Amino acid sequence: MARMRHFLKRCPAVLLSAALLAAAAGTAAAADTPAPTLGIYTTGDMGGRLYREDPVTGEAVEYSYQNVASAMEAERASVDAALLLDSGDAVDNGLVQDGGAAEALALRAIGYDALVPAVGEFRLGPEARDDFFAALGEASEDGAPVRVLSGNYLDEDTQSPEEDAYEVFTVELGRRAVRIGVLGLGAMEAPEELPESFVSGVRFAHRDNTSGSYSWEWTGYWQERLG
């Protein structure tokens, strides 16, 4: 679609450092009726870029959440239903960052359905990270809650997910409800890149995942439980 930008990807299926659970996406339609359309969109590595212009330099910013908002307004008008997902590194880790408060507000206002945290979110530090995740989930007049999904951000001792591992979204297509499952996987490299105090008490792969791979997290753990 010509109007789409590089920062906004439209996918026939979701692979968001994650796995798309089986879902019946087909919708029966009369021969003379166009089939309803579901658009699934992803962004990632936005790094706290909120505006079309850098507030310090005044230079144009090609990849920003303000641009996403405009693009999604057009995309939502062109499809019958839409999911909007972010694969993480959404926040600014610079010297003047605000702990992700502005990014959380932007994600909610734009109408993101879920975020899969990447290393950037964990660079905030434990307290600011938890505040950012909580701010995403707030229900307020500032926008709808955004789900934080991670099936490999785990408690060190219990190996239970610290956030919801997955979500099954239901969208209406024509006269059918279509269920789409999204499992979040990300930030597996966090222990190697961050201070120990930032990842104390948590782990980013199940103990049996000796290869340290995202594919194992799906095939070796989640596929059996969600299949």
Region annotations inferred by a language model:
Residues 3-15:
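Bacterial N-terminal signal peptides that target proteins for export
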Residues 31-227:
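Acidic, metal/ion-coordinating pockets
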Residues 24-25, 224:
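Low-complexity, intrinsically disordered tandem-repeat tracts enriched in small/polar residues
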